[in-house]
């Protein structure tokens, strides 16, 4: 999970959606090569925007989904975990099964590993 702090701008759409901080392709590669099986973030696109590559406006999506086969979660509210200084947890997401869809709403659950 990547907490950029962007969720603090919610629900102000103008602030939340404009030029979000996030992962670069290099950051995504680092996480993928480190063994990440899914990557989530508190912004609306996981990656930083605008893109550093004028030819590809979603370089992290391209890399994670098409090249590395790693799914992403967007708009994950990590503020409560951060506020309680919970950095190690078991995470699972209960997704709605939608036939033919490329995404789904999810109920995220984080179970702390340490007190």
Please tell me what each predicted stretch does:
Residues 1-115:
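Active-/binding-site microenvironments in catalytic and ligand-binding cores
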